[in-house]
Amino acid sequence: MSKASREELETWVDRWLQANKDCEKAGDWRPLAAFYAQDATYGWNIGPKEDVMCVGVDEIRDIALGLEMEGLENWVYEYQKVLIDEKQGEIVGFWKQIVNKSDGTQDEIYGIGGSWFRLNADNVIEWQRDFFDFGHVAKMFATLIESGDLSTGMQKRIERSIAGEKLPGYYPLGQAPVPIW
C-alpha cells in the first residue's frame, strides 16, 4: 500500500489524467502500462456471464490497454471526478465514455463508469478495477451499428466474440485467477 502524502497522490492523479488524454489523442492506451507494478492486476465485470482479469503488467499492456481498446480509437474517457484516499493509497475516478461519431457529433454511454485503483509502496498501480453499466454499453454499440458509426476495429471484435473465439483475459463469472473483489 502507498505511503504517499495527499500532495504526492494528487500529483500522481494529475500525471495519470494527462497520460490518459495523451493516449486518447494517439489512439493507443498501451503507454499507460508504465503506471502499473510488474505484478499488478486489472479487471472488470462484463455482464452476467464473464469477468475480465489481466494479471501482470504484460497482460495489462497487451490485453486491457491493447486488445480491449482496439476499436475505441474514436472514444474518450473524460474523468468527471476523482476521489483520493491517502490513508489506504486508493483512488477512484469517475468517467464518461464518449464516442466521436463520423458526422462530427458525439454520443455517450449513459450511467456511471469509473476506475478504482490501489497504489503500492512505489506509487504504481497494485490493482485496478473498472465499473460501468454493461447494459448501456451494449445499447450504445447497437446504436452505433444502426447508424454505421461502429469502428472497423470494434466490428472485428464483435465478430470474433459472436464466432465464439476465446478472448484472452475473459473468464466465466467468478473464475478469474484473481477475484474482482
Task: Label the model's feature ranges.
Residues 13-24, 50-53, 70-74, 126, ...:
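Short, mixed-charge, low-aromatic patches
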Residues 1-13, 52-63:
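Charged, low-complexity, helix/coiled-coil-prone segments
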Residues 29-91:
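A solvent-exposed, acidic/Ser-Thr-rich amphipathic alpha-helical stretch
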Residues 2-39, 70:
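Short acidic-aromatic low-complexity motifs
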Residues 3-4, 8, 68-181:
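A beta-strand edge to alpha-helix "cap/lid" segment located at domain peripheries
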Residues 5, 17, 45-49, 102:
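Residue-level detector of alpha-helix boundaries and kinks
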